[in-house]
């Protein structure tokens, strides 16, 4: 199982988990982040709630951060990643200087 902390505007917003590679994902908002109403949800399609969001595919707010087409092939080849490993790719490219307010940092075990 791979995990990543999701930051929104440099504040810890929640935890993204891949339970089954390529098929099972969970996003859980950080309780303190939700309590501060000056913070925004990570996506309009994922409003604040205490229950985890679960999906059979990586949530669109995160897949939209990934390169596409020829750029994806080049990036995956250079990092020796499977082009279908969206979570692995997210962990490599979304750690800093992203377009938008969200960054993602892998939780090391």
What are these regions (language model features)?
Residues 1-109:
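Phosphate/dinucleotide-binding and metal-coordinating scaffold of catalytic cores
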